[in-house]
Amino acid sequence: DGISLEDLLEKRTGNMMQPQLAEKIAKATRKEFVDGIAAHGTDALRFTLAALASNGRDINWDMKRLEGYRNFCNKLWNASRFVLTNDKLDLSQGEIEFSVADRWIQSEFNRTVESFRSALSQYRFDLCANAIYEFTWNQFCDWYLELTKPVFANGNAAQIRAASQTLVHVLEKLLRLAHPLIPFITEEIWQKVKGFVGITADSIMLQPFPQVEENGFDPEAEAEIEWLKEVIVAVRNIRAESNIAPSKGLDLLFRNLSAENAKILEKQTALLKAMAKLDNVQVLAANETHASVAKLVGNAELLVPMAGFINKEAELARLTKEIEKYQNEVKRIENKLSNEAFVAKAPKAVITKEREKQAEYQSGLEKIQEQYKAIEAL
């Protein structure tokens, strides 16, 4: 429910064993919690406590973690609303054709159940929370929901039925898996989901806890989607680095593509085009060259021709300024670390942080220089 600053001060300084510390604690409290503590919700608090409950140490409370897990609860709520309000959802009887994405998310959920139950048997509630968070945010929300959009937009009836069934069934099972950690939001959402999967029970608490399905693992689908994800992320990074709008279609060229990945590409070209906003996808011969921006995915080279997408001179001028900026930062830190007086007096943690910053700037400089060379070659 949160707490006002006045009530928080009273709690932290009232009935103290060492009243002489009251003023110091009050000052620190006013500085850290200017407006008190806002309401974050019971589920977010429970999830935070579970995530911090690793073995053999005291909990070092972090309000940022609480805020992050409140956002996680919001993410789950919004994802559920996206599923349940999808006007193209089709749960009718008929032929179904599961896509590689449908198979992948079901396999990933099965692995999540395995991880969760293993952690629970060892009372590692932190690992339970991490398993739920990783699957919900990084797999289900960030990827699977996006992978279903091309199906609902352009898929046939059998594919749409398969995606619809997968969405609601995985969501329902996920709510059951997460219920021990975040009982209130999962109950609330489950009451809306249960009708979609034909359940008539009164409460999620009366449902069986998810079990690992021995035949529920699909390594082939996992490998295909993981490779496609790497390619999609690489193309998106090229867009971001070259300031190309997400709505503009690109051509994507592959070089040194393995036979295994070539088969994946052949099967999943349509999905890749939709997810990465590509106009054309082509595999080049090993010695064939093109003036393009390149990224590596494994041993394969991804080439994106940039002619017509950017103003070459303006982009080179922009990158030149960036290079100068990073060079100046690297030089500034080098000068600081070469100053014997600074090194002798500065705390070890400060020196370590400066070295980390130096490494970050050096890495950034090298990446920008690579971009410069690629644009210069166009």
Swiss-Prot record:
EC number(s) reported in the record: 6.1.1.9
UniProt keyword annotations, A-Z: Aminoacyl-tRNA synthetase, ATP-binding, Coiled coil, Cytoplasm, Ligase, Nucleotide-binding, Protein biosynthesis
InterPro entries linked to this entry: Anticodon_Ia_Val (IPR033705), M/V/L/I-tRNA-synth_anticd-bd (IPR013155), tRNA-bd_arm (IPR010978), tRNAsynth_Ia_anticodon-bd (IPR009080), Val-tRNA_synth_C_sf (IPR037118), Val-tRNA_synth_tRNA-bd (IPR019499), Valyl-tRNA_ligase (IPR002303)
Enzymatic reactions: tRNA(Val) + L-valine + ATP = L-valyl-tRNA(Val) + AMP + diphosphate
Residues forming coiled coils: 307-377
Compartment(s): Cytoplasm
Annotated Gene Ontology cellular component terms: cytosol
A single BP term in Gene Ontology: valyl-tRNA aminoacylation
Presence of the UniProt keyword DNA repair in the record: no
GO molecular function per UniProt: ATP binding; valine-tRNA ligase activity
One Pfam family from the record: Val_tRNA-synt_C
Protein's job: Catalyzes the attachment of valine to tRNA(Val). As ValRS can inadvertently accommodate and process structurally similar amino acids such as threonine, to avoid such errors, it has a 'posttransfer' editing activity that hydrolyzes mischarged Thr-tRNA(Val) in a tRNA-dependent manner.
Matches recorded under PANTHER family: VALINE--TRNA LIGASE, CHLOROPLASTIC_MITOCHONDRIAL 2, VALYL-TRNA SYNTHETASES
Family: Belongs to the class-I aminoacyl-tRNA synthetase family. ValS type 1 subfamily.
Domain statement: ValRS has two distinct active sites: one for aminoacylation and one for editing. The misactivated threonine is translocated from the active site to the editing site.
Subunit structure: Monomer.
Protein name, UniProt field: Valine--tRNA ligase
Species of the source: Haemophilus parainfluenzae
